[in-house]
């Protein structure tokens, strides 16, 4: 507001999603000069296209980035150097409310206490790499790009040119599983090093 305070305009802006949000990334995926948002959730993710007037439109289905599992993080980056932002979405684990496991620990008094189960109690799920088609849609290129790994329990992805060769590489932080460092081969594929 210009006075050191913020005003909640999520409803007016059209981003008042009622899901269980776990992460968000920002990037201009359609090259119109306005920053768009990708929201990851325990449940359906949402891609919000910035309309340039202070509002956003949900274009998740038309953009073909509608994951419905437990996604925990995402990151925009131009891995194929074609001038538009691609999208990597990390997925946490194969967890369903109706299949919830009960986990217990024994406290110092010898009593069993119910706790949230750690990540290793659940099988991991594969993350997804979406290539931007340049027309407002994306294609899932996870397997052919070499980043398919079903055991991940992905938390947070980050694009960076760690080897300084002119193309961005991908680091994925995981829970209860080793992290992934995918080196960009410069031809649309990656190698997990």
Regions found by a protein language model. Give the residues of each.
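Acidic, glycine/proline-rich Ca2+-coordinating loop motifs
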Residues: 1-193
């Amino acid at each position: 507001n210009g006075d050191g305070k913020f005003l909640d305009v999520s409803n007016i802006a059209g981003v008042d999603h009622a899901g269980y949000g776990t992460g968000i990334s920002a990037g201009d995926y359609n090259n119109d000069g306005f920053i768009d948002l990708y929201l990851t959730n325990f449940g359906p993710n949402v891609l919000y296209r910035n309309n340039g007037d202070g509002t956003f439109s949900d274009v998740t289905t038309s953009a073909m980035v509608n994951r419905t599992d437990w996604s925990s993080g995402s990151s925009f980056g131009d891995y194929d150097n074609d001038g538009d932002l691609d999208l990597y979405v990390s997925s946490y684990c194969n967890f369903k409310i109706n299949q919830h496991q009960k986990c217990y620990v024994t406290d110092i008094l010898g009593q069993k206490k119910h706790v949230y189960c750690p990540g290793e109690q659940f099988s991991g799920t594969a993350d997804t790499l979406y290539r931007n088609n340049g027309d407002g849609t994306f294609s899932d290129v996870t397997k052919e790009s070499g980043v398919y790994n079903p055991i991940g329990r992905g938390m947070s992805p980050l694009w960076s040119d760690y080897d300084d060769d002119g193309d961005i590489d991908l680091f994925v932080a995981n829970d209860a599983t080793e992290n992934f460092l995918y080196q960009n081969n410069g031809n649309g594929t990656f190698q997990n090093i």
